[in-house]
């Protein structure tokens, strides 16, 4: 995913428009004195609107149905009824727990274990390598300036620069075979 862990953990179902495919980042999860609560995001630029692909929307719909069944079984014991990602008692999942769940999913799928932040980095790298504008990438990641994006992912931009040079070289100086 391309969200910070706290943003992902703080998602409520009213932050996701399943019919239009839009996800709104409006909160982050903070933990104080052992209690989790939603707070405003890291910066004003962190609040954002992200369009989700259809396959993610399908997975979210399935998750929502499964979660509704679990909430029904739990009765009144479900702690946060609107949270998207919860533990077995319906309380917020914290980042470390999400990473444990992600590791289990990867193991079941026969994939190497990864962390949530790796998904954020991969998302940014794929966008960069697809020549998406730095401003669009910065907006999706919640960076207030493109400088943050460029500084953080400069190595990926450098790789793209080499590919761009090779493409120009092929187009201008090499004959198609």
Positions of PLM-derived features:
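Structural detector for helix-capping/boundary residues
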Residues: 6, 11-14, 96, 122, ...
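Short, charged phosphate-coordinating catalytic segments
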Residues: 3-29, 135
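Short, basic (Lys/Arg/His-rich) helix/loop patches that form interaction surfaces
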Residues: 50, 66-74, 80-139, 143
């Amino acid at each position: 995913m391309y969200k910070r862990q706290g943003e992902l953990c703080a998602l409520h179902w009213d932050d996701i428009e399943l019919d239009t495919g839009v996800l709104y980042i409006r909160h982050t999860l903070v933990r104080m004195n052992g209690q989790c609560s939603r707070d405003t995001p890291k910066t004003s630029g962190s609040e954002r609107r992200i369009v989700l692909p259809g396959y993610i929307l399908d997975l979210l719909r399935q998750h929502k149905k499964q979660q509704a069944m679990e909430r029904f079984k739990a009765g009144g014991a479900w702690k946060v009824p609107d949270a998207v990602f919860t533990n077995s008692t319906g309380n917020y999942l914290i980042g470390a727990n999400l990473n444990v769940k992600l590791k289990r999913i990867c193991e079941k799928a026969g994939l190497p274990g990864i962390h949530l932040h790796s998904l954020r980095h991969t998302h940014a790298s794929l966008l960069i390598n697809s020549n998406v504008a730095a401003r669009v990438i910065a907006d999706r990641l919640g960076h207030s300036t493109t400088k943050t994006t460029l500084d953080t992912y400069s190595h990926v931009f450098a790789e793209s620069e080499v590919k761009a040079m090779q493409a120009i070289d092929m187009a201008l100086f090499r004959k198609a075979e």
